[in-house]
């Protein structure tokens, strides 16, 4: 077996997952977005590198200094015309949409204006639409040893999602809505029934009081057209049910398997 690699610049590392499509493999490092393809001998090569604003430090609710995004391929025809990620700019994060073919940045759009400037999640991408979720201030039980200090050290978890649409002529992007959904998992779009599904987290007394070990967790369905919550159903309580911003898997029939800090939940939505 032959193993080949591409060296990153000094001080740059991969802290998130990667994404693959027929157009190549997308990698977000702590400094930039890369698209990797292969040369005539099958060795990996960098097609392009797109820098983003990594900010001045790791933020609370993120696990590394830099973008927390696994890059997302999306598009209206092939599903791979665009790539997207969320940067780590200090005071206001932005959603970047890049042409997969050329690496040209089509837009750098402010997002998550109500929930805090940070996201550790991979954005949803479908058609010309991207949906991002805030994890700013999320109380992870631990962070990687090499994560570095967060600035500030802690912050309240408010949550929130933003929908951004790429214009048909690729001249830019527009924000369609922003909500205050307190997503505790990586939101997923169910194209079969046209809903965003996730797990939400709520303080048992009042969300304004912040997160607590006694928080309750709910299966939630969100309307991608408006950002409104369609339903919430209690599925657990206390940090034993915390999905810590991990991604669930949807099985045939709509059943969701969601990991938590203590195991796996099987969630069958009520009809």
Regions from the language model: what does each represent?
Residues 1, 38-42, 99-103, 166-169, ...:
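Short loop/turn segments that connect beta-strands within beta-propeller blades
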Residues 1, 33-35, 95-98, 159-163, ...:
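Hydrophobic beta-strand positions in blades of beta-propellers and related beta-sheet-rich domains
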Residues 1-20, 24-29, 33:
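Mobile, glycine-rich extracellular loop/lid and propeptide segments
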Residues 7-11, 45-64, 108-116, 174-183, ...:
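Surface-exposed loop and turn segments in beta-propeller and other repeat-based domains
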Residues 10-22, 60, 66-70, 114-125, ...:
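Repeated scaffold domains used in trafficking and secretory/extracellular systems
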Residues 242-271:
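Blade-level signature of beta-propeller repeat domains, shared across WD40, Kelch, NHL, RCC1
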